[in-house]
Amino acid sequence: MAAWMPQNIQKRLLRYVLQQLSLFAEIDLPNLDVSLGTNSKVHLKELQLDPDKVDIPNFYLRNGVVDDMDLTLTLSNGVNIEATGVNLTLAPSMTNGVDFDPGKLSFSLYQSTADLATSVFFVDQDNNELPKTDKELDDEHDSSKNVANDDDSSPLADKENPKQPSKMGNMMAKAVEMALSRLQVQLKDINLTIITDESTFQICIEEASFDTTDGVRKIEFKGAELSVLKPSVYPGDQPQGESQDDSEDDDSVDESSSFDSHPTDFMSSSFIGSREELENSMLNSQSSVYMSATSKLLTKPKHSTRHPSETKPSVTLGHVNEGTLTFEGLQSFENVSIIIDQIHVAVSPIPESLTALLETLSKRLKILRVHSAKSKPSTTTTYTFSSKDGLQEEPEFSDQISTSSSTGFKELKINEIVISLNSALGKNGAFAIDNSLCLSIESLELAMVSEGNLSGTLKTLKMNKSETSEVFSFQPGSNYDVRFEMILDDDNDLYNITILCPKPGVFNLNEEVLNHLLSFCSKIPSTLHSLQSYQYQKAKLASLSNPQSNSNNDQENEIYLQTASFEFILQLTSSDKVKLTSFPLSFNSNTGVIEVERIVVERKFKENQVQGDPPSQDRFKMQPHKSTNSGCLTCRKRQVKCDERKPFCLNCEKSEQKCTGFTHLSKDLPSSSSSLSSDDSYKSILLINGLKTYLFKKPKKVKTFDKSGIQCSYLSPNASEIELIELEMTMSDFTSLIDSLELFFEQLKVVNHPKMDIAKEKTVFRTSFNSRNPVRNPRALGSQTGAMFSHSSLVSFLRINSVSFLLKEALNGFGDVSGRIKSINCNFHVKGFQDFFVGSLDVARIHKLSSQLILEKVDAPGNKKPMLIARLKSSSLTIQLADCLAHYYGEWFSFLHQCNMKEREIVKRQEDIGPKDRARDSNNFVISLHLNNIIIELNPVSLKSKAVLFIKKGCGTVTFGSQRLSISSSLTEITPLLIDDTKNLKNEIKLDSKNSHPLGNSFLLLLMDMGYISMGMLSSVSVSFETESSASLIAPVNVNVMCDTLRLDICADSLQCLLNLIKDLRQPIIVPFEQKYRTQPETPLDALKDVDFDAFLPQKTKDSNNVAATKTRTFSETALNGAFRPKVYSDGSLEIIDNYYEHESVNQGLDNRTYGDLEVFEENSEDDISLENSLNMKHDHFYHTSFMDNTRNTEHVPFKLNLSVEAVYIRLFDGYDWKETRVSILNAVRRVEAKAAAELSRIEKIRNTKLRRDSSASNSGNEGSLQTDDDSATSGSVSEPVIEETLYQSIHLSLPVGMEPTLLAERVNNDVNFKRASSDSLDKTQSPSSVSSKSQVSSPQTRRLKLKRSTFHKVALELRNLSITFKLLSSFDPTTIKNKSSIRNPNSAEIVNRISVEVDDFLITDNIPTSIWKTFVTYLKEAGSRELNSKMVHLDIATIRPTRLLATTEMRIETNVLPLRLYVDQDTLDFLTRFGEFKDLRFVPQVVDDDDLFVSKLHVFPVRLKLDYKPKTVDYAGIRSGKTSEFMNFFILDEASIGLRKGWTWIGGLNNQVNSHTKREYGTPDITRNQLKGVLSGLASINSVVKISSGFKDLIAIPMEEYRRDGRLITGVRKGAFSFAKTTGNELLKLGVKLVAGTQTILENTEQVLGGEGNLARMPVQVKERKQRRDSDEGNFYVITDRQTYERNLKKTSMNESIIGKTSLREANRFDEEYDDDDDDEDDLVNKIKPHLRNTMLDSQLFLDDNEIEDEXRGARRPDESQKTISLYANQPTTMKEGLQLAYQSFGRNIDSAKRAISKASSKVSEDNRTSNIAYEVMKATPVVVLRPIIGTTEAVSKALLGGLNQFDPDNRSKSEDKYKQ
């Protein structure tokens, strides 16, 4: 046939055949080479595909070029097509992407094959004709097209001839099948380029073939490769020396040259302008950038033969070496089988490439959605099949195509998949690095078991770094590693996917592996963000085209996952491994629950085995079990073995879980515990039991707390819950684990890959992603998840029910630390911060079968707030701690000390090794702490007492920096409380509704109800802490403590308890005596070896005995003997005695001795000091030079403490706080009273016997005899020892024999209440006969004791601006040094620490009721005005170690005090003495230091004192016993001047062991020599005489001084006269005031004795009324101090059952001190309430019987302490005029008193006219009537004189205001 066909006819025929394939555009005849025959061959060049005739789903064909194409037509083999250089350019199609029809893919293939069959087989319906000419063929072709068009336009023709197309369809199907069976296609060098706005991908296939055998289509390909051209991404790790960018072109080389294989005139073809799809793709003007970019991609310069990938480097993503695709059928695919040999994937560039692609698709979807919304109704283009496309009308075949859209999948097999996490992928699929981290998958098979049922297996899944280094692998076995199946649900067309991992897996992780994994994971969030945005835009577009699609989208495929156990082994160091074992995991997407039965963390530390620790039994391991179910995969019953011996371990119950989704897998999950590696060297440290994670389809509400701790609900897309977490390990292992983790994470750094040069890119890929906020756009997760990102939404929620931990051997000998945390809620907010809430936290110490609480929660009624609230942000952590009780025990101090010593050794070793460079974070991490209702309990070592610090509110900040750690805190109020014995506590620290207080300070009131005593208050406390390093315990530390107000309210017993408790808060460190003092020298020492005994002897001819005596004189004799002084003769010469130079040398040696570098200053001894001269203010008073300033400067200060208190108030109360103290005093009084009563009975018995014996005697004789006996008894009572007993070394109970026993209780009360008048009687000797018979009956009123704390304080100490500075200058401890030779300068001294105390103002206030003076100690104003910034008290204390080898230390003290003014009342002095001497052996620690602090030197700088002393009683018994100090009570001192000599220094010991006599001997010479004159001048009897005589002296001395100086006699006389007048006038006026005041006092006392008011007449009216009301017997008066009793009494309806007192409730003022009413003993109330209430209130009493309770309850009511004794010198008038006015008022007031007395007596006389009554009333009124006018006169004269005195000397009034109570 080919012989007679012309060449042009052959070409036209072949062109027609090719055009009928619907694949190619117009074919140019010059590029067509035809050779026809039996083996016809057609060769085509640069053949272009027609984009309009190629329809690929979701893509547009932009360009298609085939470089060379050969078609071979044979009669036997059919058609063979061979093509080389197939280049296709695609772009995503948004319109087809909306409504994707799977049938279009099949139809396009059918259309091409049908056209081929039409071209090959010329079917004629009428007859067979020969082929027509070229022109005829063309005309027929055109006519056939028209007919086809007409048929398309006439639908009636289809209906009229329904059967004819069926016949033609069957014939056409056979023709297509025949054509395909003889068609063979082979393609080489296939390049498929997919271009988008911001990314370009390329698929290269080396070779692909298509053939059909027995109806089975087979497609084979080799060398398929996927690469990315744009953007520039990191390809992965490459061998060193190779550049990541192989392009060497400059910026002038445009990237358009990479596609130069395309024709130059391609843009002018009909491809651009004729296609409607191109216009649809360019919906908005924003896409013009894309067209300008792609236009260059599609152009090609002429004569270019380079491959598209040769000019621009591409990054390979994946490579497939070979694969085969087989299927059957044409319009519907059946038995599709895919077999792939090997796939290599490089993961490193995938995230960035995929992110760029998803960003582009999301942007284009958004544009399409906007365009579709504007052009409603939708104009989405659909494919229309017509005859012009070359398809004949075949209705039956068309229906078959449209309905057959499903494909028949058979199997998928992949032999191997290798995914590299870090290596780049080179050519031919080879990885650039051989030992890269790769994930390998072998033998992946997926098969269709039945219709809608897919089953797959994965034989091997592992991850390795090399052939020998496995990172992850499953346990070897015959089973597959992974099995899965997919079951189609016909009802909703969804799949039930089941995934099963039946074999245990093991992960081996190290630093390098984690670096690669973290590097890859760091890129995932941005890709997920882009994917979420794409899904959101796609869902929005779908909902726009089909609004009902949202309801269908709610249904998703169900996924069921079940795994065996997994082990994660983390290699921290070469010797430290941590293994995490996750027991079976299950997941059900239907319920959204991920459940892990248990997670166990174990550790393997080689050093543990070296130390000999036996491997511990793992109490977290699970027991193996055998499976019994063979058809269904279920979770078996598993039981957790718990060690019941552990205090915190919970008994875990059995749990059974069933998964309903695993129904078609034939094999069971084996026992996970039996499959795990059984390495006994691992030790279990952590258990996580019952982990569940809930993934909600829609956000749900979870109950949690807000930032204030109030319960609320949040929306969360997921929630997790952990039932139990247990931690158990030793503290050493814990610290070593922390160190290993710290070192590991310091070395663990995410690899920062080098950024590619994207300057050449014209479109830069931009993406913003915040790892802490993965979704910035709330709508990025779809319409359903967008609602959760509101102000009350969470990203995730976690709840932990219980956490238990046990840290063994926390410190050396400390024991174990156990704790439990309950109800932990974790809120992970959308904004990136996290909130943590802890319901309760309990921590305890376990040591030797005993436990000690460390931290616990205090429950309050109705308080459901969590104990701890924490909020974690990027660089800050905020913690709120409330209702917490912390415990401290004194024995812990030794453990902390040992820990500090170990830290020092470690630091020393590190210093020897050298500094270790570690990368430090330059950013600071801040922890903010807020405290509310915090109780700190202080437990001493040996004492039974306990202290509590109650912190109401506080806040603090901790800042961790790279080189420093700083802590600052502020506490609003701290209340210290104290209890003497813990057994006296009434109940536990637990609040409930029964004993809760309605007041705000419920915790504080609760503590006081339990038995604690409030000791004061600290307000506005600020603490700051700074150190140079946060990683070391011995780094230099600087602590600053500031407090606004410190108030301390104490009694004598509570003060001693407090001081000893503070001392007992640390366990004393006992150092052996030999080690402390080193009494035995290492080498023999001859102290007198080099001593020249004759060096200082002036005459060697002296008597040898004197020389010997001088040599043997001891140091103490020389230093303390004041007789060694040179004798001064009258002519001024000195007698040189033998011991003079010896004495001087000794003193010089003492004063100038040095301790190494420590220099002691030299004394300036000046014997005499003039006290008459005024005080000369020196500017350098406080800037003296002392041994403190001459010490060497220490560059390194390990610790520095600065304490600053603005105001300090120490108030001393009388009475006793502790009940045991009061009971002891009561019992002692009873014992003395019993002895006195027995002696009194014996005396009465003797007296009665004598009376009966002498009954015959006369009355006078009897009286004389009785008087004699009484005298003898009296004399005997004086000579005999009195009945006495001493308590607490300060309370002396004594009663002379024969005295009334009841007087002892009265005296005790008077001593406490300062009633001197009635107590003086005990000082006198009385005989038993003087006691009347009525007095022998002890009334309850006289026997009651009042021993509780007084209502008002008696003495107050006030300090202003107290500053204490403590510097630790040396942290050297010689007890820890074993090698003495390593000590530097062992014989030199060093200063261990230094304390500096400064006080701006110092004041002691006298509040004793019987004292008329206001202050006790204050500043001496006569000394002049104080200098600016001068300190009233300055004290320097230095602790010195004499030599560095000694463990003992000594102290040196320097003190400076400004001039002081003292007003000493004997009552106040006795109170302070009794207060200070109190000592209770209960509060003495059992273990104390061997020696007290040794004060080697005390230096007191000159102090000027002015003293007023007012004695009241004289202890004659003390005088008789040799107490000579009682003689001072005979004299009153007024302005006595005392001055300590300059530079008073004590050298020697001042500890308790030093004899007090020695101390007095040292100071007595100075007092007798220098101070006696000032003391005698201050005697009140001669003070005025001395001052008047000094005025006469000035009258003579001043003129003489003036005349001697300048010769002016008259001026001197005038000055002398003025001084004389002023001095004499003042003293005369003062003397007159004293005489008048003395007279008034005598008269008032006389009146009071005779029944008048006395000095009460001068008291305010309110005080008198209060006293009269309390003394009246009209009704009972009660003061209730117990709130419970008060609340019970309020419920009583009858006032007769309980009479509430006339005062307000004491609880409301329990912190106030100024009460208007008495502090009645609460035990006095006990007798007035019901017995059962009394037993309830006194359940903690120490008495043994009820009688003793009642005896103490009959305590006498205190006198009115608010009644002050007002002096006649108080309230002085300012001027003479005011004095006269006050004189007139006082005289009138006294006259009125006399009138009232007369009128009162007259009215009573008129009522009763009896003579006796008249006489009684007259006698009662006479003293008042007679004495009151005289008292008024004296008072008036006194006021007038005081007015004149103050006007003449205004300073006198200011002195009186400071001295007297007003």
From Swiss-Prot:
SUPFAM superfamilies from the UniProt entry: Zn2/Cys6 DNA-binding domain (SSF57701)
Any Pfam family hit: ATG2_CAD
GO CC term (a single one): phagophore assembly site membrane
Molecular function in Gene Ontology: DNA binding; DNA-binding transcription factor activity, RNA polymerase II-specific; phosphatidylinositol-3-phosphate binding; protein-membrane adaptor activity; zinc ion binding
Domain of life where this protein originates: Eukaryota
Residue span of region Disordered: 130-167, 230-266, 298-317, 1251-1278, 1317-1344
DNA-binding region coordinates: 632-659
Membrane association type: Peripheral membrane protein
Compartment(s) of residence: Prevacuolar compartment; Preautophagosomal structure membrane; Endoplasmic reticulum membrane
Recorded catalytic activity of this chain's protein: a 1,2-diacyl-sn-glycero-3-phosphocholine(in) = a 1,2-diacyl-sn-glycero-3-phosphocholine(out); a 1,2-diacyl-sn-glycero-3-phospho-L-serine(in) = a 1,2-diacyl-sn-glycero-3-phospho-L-serine(out); a 1,2-diacyl-sn-glycero-3-phosphoethanolamine(in) = a 1,2-diacyl-sn-glycero-3-phosphoethanolamine(out)
Alphabetical UniProt keywords: Autophagy, DNA-binding, Endoplasmic reticulum, Lipid transport, Membrane, Metal-binding, Protein transport, Transcription, Transcription regulation, Transport, Zinc
Biased composition annotated in UniProt, kind: Acidic residues: 243-254
GO biological process: autophagosome assembly; autophagy of mitochondrion; glycophagy; lipid transport; piecemeal microautophagy of the nucleus; protein transport; reticulophagy
InterPro entries: ATG2, Zn2-C6_fun-type_DNA-bd_sf, Zn2Cys6_DnaBD
Ranges of biased composition (kind: Low complexity): 1324-1342
Compositional bias of kind Polar residues: 1256-1278
Domain notes: The C-terminus (1237-1862) is required for the location to the perivacuolar compartment. The absence of either ATG1, ATG18, ATG9 or VPS15 also prevents the correct location.
Family of this protein: Belongs to the ATG2 family.
Record function comment: Lipid transfer protein required for autophagosome completion and peroxisome degradation. Tethers the edge of the isolation membrane (IM) to the endoplasmic reticulum (ER) and mediates direct lipid transfer from ER to IM for IM expansion. ATG2 binds to the ER exit site (ERES), which is the membrane source for autophagosome formation, using basic residues in its N-terminal region (NR) and to the expanding edge of the IM through its C-terminal region. The latter binding is assisted by an ATG18-PtdIns3P interaction.
Cited PANTHER family: AUTOPHAGY-RELATED 2, ISOFORM A (PTHR13190:SF1)
Protein name, as recorded: Autophagy-related protein 2
Gene name for this UniProt entry: ATG2
